[in-house]
From Swiss-Prot:
InterPro entries on file: Asn/Gln-tRNA_amidoTrfase_suB/E, Asn/Gln-tRNA_Trfase_suB/E_cat, Asn/Gln_amidotransferase, Asn/Gln_tRNA_amidoTrase-B-like, GatB, GatB_Yqey_C_2, Gln-tRNA_amidoTrfase_suB_CS, Gln_synth/guanido_kin_cat_dom
Gene: gatB
Source organism phylogeny: Bacteria, Bacillati, Mycoplasmatota, Mycoplasmoidales, Metamycoplasmataceae
Catalytic activity field: L-glutamyl-tRNA(Gln) + L-glutamine + ATP + H2O = L-glutaminyl-tRNA(Gln) + L-glutamate + ADP + phosphate + H(+); L-aspartyl-tRNA(Asn) + L-glutamine + ATP + H2O = L-asparaginyl-tRNA(Asn) + L-glutamate + ADP + phosphate + 2 H(+)
SUPFAM superfamilies (alphabetical): GatB/YqeY motif (SSF89095), Glutamine synthetase/guanido kinase (SSF55931)
PROSITE patterns recorded: GATB
Descriptive protein name: Aspartyl/glutamyl-tRNA(Asn/Gln) amidotransferase subunit B
GO biological process: glutaminyl-tRNAGln biosynthesis via transamidation; translation
GO MF term set: asparaginyl-tRNA synthase (glutamine-hydrolyzing) activity; ATP binding; glutaminyl-tRNA synthase (glutamine-hydrolyzing) activity
Keywords of this entry: ATP-binding, Ligase, Nucleotide-binding, Protein biosynthesis
Chain's role: Allows the formation of correctly charged Asn-tRNA(Asn) or Gln-tRNA(Gln) through the transamidation of misacylated Asp-tRNA(Asn) or Glu-tRNA(Gln) in organisms which lack either or both of asparaginyl-tRNA or glutaminyl-tRNA synthetases. The reaction takes place in the presence of glutamine and ATP through an activated phospho-Asp-tRNA(Asn) or phospho-Glu-tRNA(Gln).
Enzyme class: ligase
Documented EC number(s): 6.3.5.-
Amino acid sequence: MNTFETVIGIEIHIELNTKTKMFSPAPNKFNEKPNTLVHPIDVAYPGTLPRLNKEAVVKAIKLAKALNMEIDTLLRFDRKNYFYPDLPKSFQITQQNFPIGKNGTLTIESNGKKKEILIERIHLEEDTAKQIHLNDKTLVDYNRAGVPLIEIVTKPIISNAEEAANYVDMIRKIVSFIDISDAKMSEGSLRADVNISIRPFGQKFLGEKVEIKNLNSVSNLKKAIEFEKNLQIKKILSNEKIESQTKRFDESKNETVVMRTKSKTIDYKYIPEPNIPFIRIPKDFIDKIKVENLPWNIEKKLLSQNISSEFVQQFLNDFQMLLVFESIIYPNREKLSKVFFSELISLANSKNVHIKDLKFNFSEFVIALKFLDNGEISGKHLKTIINEIFTKNEKVEDIVSRNNLRLISDEDLIFNLINKASKDKNEIILEYPNKPEKVLKYLTGFVMKETEGQANPVLSFNLAKKYLDEKFKKV
């Protein structure tokens, strides 16, 4: 099988998070009651004319900049003509001939090596309605008709499932971080189609390609590519013909399934869209559109704050989580990240909510961290305080006082206890030069026991060490 090369191209459809649809003022929302977000333009009522959504254009320009693309300053649209129940106009408005962005690049990492993915084009278009198959009937929900889409098309340069998965995952992160889409594959706001073919190493022309439609997760994309690659190689070795087909991925069987065979290229009879005039985009308009929060810049910043790579990857996989973390004003980001995941994320998970939806007073949480920094409470107490901030929405000062959580930081009191322990167990103290850890543990433990755990353990340890160092310096 190593004598064959896999060639993959990917088309990604992204639903934009605009307030309204691509060509109508209907709201652009997900999971609403069927056919309640429909404007006459969406269902092609006679006499209606499309009105281009400026917000969608801005988001397309942001993506083009993020992907290092050439931006076409003259907006032009085309009609893609075909008949299907989910297409009320019998044509889709798209940018077949003049995409808003072309010739882009995106660097990914796969198996420890960097690779530049060449992106042929991105273009704006409108989504179709949603078909729902129920028993022997097909229902149509027009809420999705006219939702703004960006399609991202790579050149056939991807070589394996790992590269494909990493590319799609990086696109998902980019569109989330620059706030043009929520990129939730499970909800269909990011959908990937894969074109895959096999050829012997060294062969210049491409083999017959198979398209796998609507892959709804990165893991399924990897499985689909692996299965289809092995299937095509097996057919070649058996002298079977590979047909140009459209397939879907069956999750229950982990295999690709034929939807239809492409006997010939479909002629969509593209024509210029007559109801949307050409629109010139001024250069200063493009220059004012800034692209911030790119994943690689965020990663670099978080790592520079000494946040562990494990936590950084979790932030990169969940932009909403990162936004919550960034909103917490506390200087020690490394310490904050540890408590954020060990306590706050654990709390949110226990309540089955995302951290962004957790009804929690983060200002009081920061005060609790400052109490910890000042030695007023212990790490063990912090968990209790966080839970009571959540359940009772109380102030930290009140929680500490009511539960008697404030640590003893009276140096004279602690020093007297250390001195008492030293006299009571002088034989243990004499072991300090050879067994310093044992003696320090004993003295600190004695102080904690005498104060019923209320002494500041760090202060107790430091005072014990100071006492012992001075004692044995004199000997």
